Amino acid sequence: MAARDRHIDIKVPSPHLTPLLTAITHDEDYRLWKKSSKLFFRRGAQPLCHFVRKGSVLIARNEDAFSLGILSAPLALGFTVPLSEHLHLRTMAESEIATLPYEQVMAIVEEKQIWDLVAKHVMFVTNKIFIYNEMLTAPTSFDILRYQLLMLIQEPDEIRASTAAYQYILDRTRLSRSSIMKMLAELKKGHYIQLENGKLQAIHHLPTRF
């Protein structure tokens, strides 16, 4: 199945998250983080895992702040240590997050013998990363923009209401601002999408070619 047909899959949460959070975290582990808080996957030499039970976070690279996407609770992040240590989170809304040392998480997994649950979750997330990579390396600039619009329309209302469509796409792709603005203007002119003050309100129908 092509990425074009699977774009909606990227927003579907892992079916293994709820039992994973229940098994690993307790209420006292969670802290309330304000919007725009930044969390890293390493504290000194210690790798960390983040468990989000309320709110949404943006995942970005440390080196250039390139946005990899916005994810909403529930979330369990940090199991893939080599990859995670190059990333950070930024809360897009007030969020409840538990941050635990990776070694402590692995000790709990061993104690409760939930390796199968963790493996299934990691496989699910790995598949999402593969799909997202397909979206970012689509054949044409319009394909890339199209995928991002389909992602944006699925974001929570508060994110769509506070984020200009062009900025959302600019932060997550290597497309130029001018090409993004041109394609959005043409889509709006053709009544394919509805934009108000630059914010995406609706997608009526997206053509497969530009």
Where do the PLM segments sit?
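Short beta-strand segments in beta-sandwich/barrel cores
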Residues: 30, 38-39, 55-61, 96
